[in-house]
Amino acid sequence: MFTLIAKNQYGQQLELTHNDAYSIKSIDGLDPPEAVINTTHNAGLDGSVYNSAYMSDRVITITLAIEGPAEENRINLYKYFKSKFPVRIYYRNATRNVYIDGYTRVVAISFFDIKQVAQITIFCPQPNFNEVMADVQDMSSIENLFEFPFSIEAAGIPFSEIIANTEKSIRNDGDLETGVQISIRATGTVVNPKIFNVETGDSMILDMTLAAGDLISIDTRTGSKAVTLTSDGVTTSVVGKLRYGSDWFSLQPGDNIFTIAADSGAEYMKAVFTVTGQFEGV
């Protein structure tokens, strides 16, 4: 069993499964997309030399029968699948709960069949499926201070304490390498905040000073790369503050060890990593 939902650019959703108005006949394009392999052929030698490879765009084709009243249900489809406009497709089965963004390429209707059939083609420039529920991982941890037996003094006692870790394993539960969203909130003065991937040696260093309350937001995902500073309610781009040679982090599937530091004030850095797992197919 599976669930298929379409969301249009206005945030309106239409479930195509478990819906008496439509009967899905087939969905093509849910498997891993075709790879394009670039090679060079050398004169006089058999075979070729591998140069590079990339995944093709994804095309999803949904074929469904339109149940009665056909006119009403067909026109309702047009609200969610508008040619050239964006649409988000949600797909859930027993092991995946994912979405993918695309654009409606064509909605073809067999108007004069006894039962009308719609074939909807969606073009997805980014071919990977994304987890619906992003995994938010805090560099800080909570140390439990509540033990039995106990007595509470007049001044009170703490039940737990937040420990600001400077190194932590950040997990990517997807099948593919993916970018990451990182937020760093300063609780005091931080000079030149730094983030390191311990295993790969990649680093990202910002040549700037943060004041208490400042928030740095980093996004290393394909198509969304950005570094911004939110200070006193105003958000500005600070990509220009990246030190030369800084890397845009990419997380391998599984555990990725990260550490945070600064020239001074590292203890005032509260870092949170948000990972959206990606998959080739469902």
Give the location of each predicted region.
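Intrinsically disordered, low-complexity segments enriched in serine, threonine, and glycine
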Residues: 137-282
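Short, surface-exposed secondary-structure junctions/capping segments
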Residues: 30-33, 114-125, 214-231
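Solvent-exposed edge beta-strands and adjacent loop segments
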Residues: 1-57, 97-108
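Oligomerization/assembly interface segments of phage tail-like spikes and tubes
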Residues: 45-68, 114-128, 256
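Short beta-strand and beta-hairpin "edge-sheet" elements
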Residues: 90-132
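A general secondary-structure signal for short beta-strands and their flanking turns/coil
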Residues: 42, 55-59, 84, 115-117, ...
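Short, acidic/charged, Gly/Pro-enriched secondary-structure junctions
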Residues: 65-107, 257-259
